[in-house]
Amino acid sequence: MSEVYLLIYTFKFLQFLTLEHTEIRVHERDIAYGRHGITVSPSEDREDMILKTIIFCGTTEVTDLDLTQYLMHIHVFFTKKNYQLFTNNCRKFSTIVLRYLDTDDNEEGNKIYA
């Protein structure tokens, strides 16, 4: 079992607009989707973003291997080319990954972007 967190960062867009970016932390890795496609990295602070909120979404029984295979399956929808800041973005990706992880208590995380 692994704990699942929704991370919400803020960042400057066009130097005058502040936007939010979401990531999922599970199996001690941060999984995100952005203008570079899907990224998976060790859990750490982001240099270009400020961590605003961490929401505990529950625990999952999905293994690291199963999650990796799932990400390989959905990567065709979340490529660098398919990224759209306001439609096909980190929030949509985070919601889909949270649903796949089927956490035992992910209702609060789903409320944010459902």
Model features per residue range: what roles?
Residues 1-91, 98-112:
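Non-catalytic ligand/cofactor/substrate-binding and regulatory segments of enzyme domains
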